[in-house]
């Protein structure tokens, strides 16, 4: 059972899940993964709605790659308009040259804001080899101020699994999203 108790437009978040979600600050990348119905998006929207110290940007990838890229550029525009224009000019990366251009931009882009959190919902809908290369490079980037949360139904990339198993990225699975006996009794 998911962490969705009907609290109007909010989700019930147990203390243990709050603690897990709060650990995102220790990582550049966080992955929240569970099958449909576990309340991943609703929990994240509730938890990060008024999270202090971060500019939280929500990008829904439940669309075409081009619409995702447009939304990504609009989110980046809030943080750094000149970089957003460069991303938009390049377009959704569909060639090796585009991938390298995006990697270079991400490696030098810093947030003018103190800290930025980009949450990409339904990331597995648009994840391909090019985006995998881009985000693998961005992981080791020296750009400061950016953290990413990827919401997925399942993780199929061995690179992501390796990051989580080596504790180099945060992984929150259906185990953390499911209600415990204490949550149900509460």
Mark where each language-model region is.
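P-loop NTPase Walker A phosphate-binding motif
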Residues: 30-58, 74
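Conserved P-loop NTPase "ATPase switch" module shared by AAA+ and STAND
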Residues: 105-131
